[in-house]
Amino acid sequence: MAKKIEAYIKLQVKSGSANPSPPVGPALGQKGVNIMEFCKAFNARTEKMEKGMPIPVVITVYSDRSFTFETKTPPASFLLKQAAGLKSGSSRPNTQKVGTIKRAKVQEIAELKAADMTGADVEAMTRSIEGTARSMGLVVED
């Protein structure tokens, strides 16, 4: 018989550096999950990724306090900032542009995020990522 699911916990944790401090500790502690077990498993799964990259993770907590977790691809905004070499996006994206990014790079990001996105095809996902870039103050050029 399948285990009864008690909760889903969604967090963004930096790759290779999960530790019991907030936000991980309190979120898992409330549900009675073994925090160190999660931290060790998460760090092992993300050790090959660039250190410090924010990784969205969905933790499924079962009624017997066991858990499973699924890692997703980094947020599009993080990948865009990394590709454009920026620390942060524009505070006024419609009037103040902070950088440019090539459409080919945007398409590459869309293909990387394809597993997590709900787009019809790569072209639609590319347009979605372009919209994210524009809302950050980036200019998308051919």
From Swiss-Prot:
One annotated GO biological process: translation
Cross-referenced Gene3D superfamilies: Ribosomal protein L11, C-terminal domain (1.10.10.250), Ribosomal protein L11/L12, N-terminal domain (3.30.1550.10)
GO cellular component: cytosolic large ribosomal subunit
GO molecular function, one term: large ribosomal subunit rRNA binding
Sorted UniProt keywords: Methylation, Ribonucleoprotein, Ribosomal protein, RNA-binding, rRNA-binding
Cysteine disulfide partners in this protein: none
SUPFAM superfamilies in UniProt: Ribosomal L11/L12e N-terminal domain, Ribosomal protein L11, C-terminal domain
Pfam families, A to Z: Ribosomal_L11 (PF00298), Ribosomal_L11_N (PF03946)
PTM characteristics: One or more lysine residues are methylated.
Entry-linked HAMAP family: Ribosomal_uL11
Family per similarity comment: Belongs to the universal ribosomal protein uL11 family.
Oligomeric and partner information: Part of the ribosomal stalk of the 50S ribosomal subunit. Interacts with L10 and the large rRNA to form the base of the stalk. L10 forms an elongated spine to which L12 dimers bind in a sequential fashion forming a multimeric L10(L12)X complex.
Protein task: Forms part of the ribosomal stalk which helps the ribosome interact with GTP-bound translation factors.
Name of the protein in question: Large ribosomal subunit protein uL11
Source organism per UniProt: Shewanella amazonensis (strain ATCC BAA-1098 / SB2B)
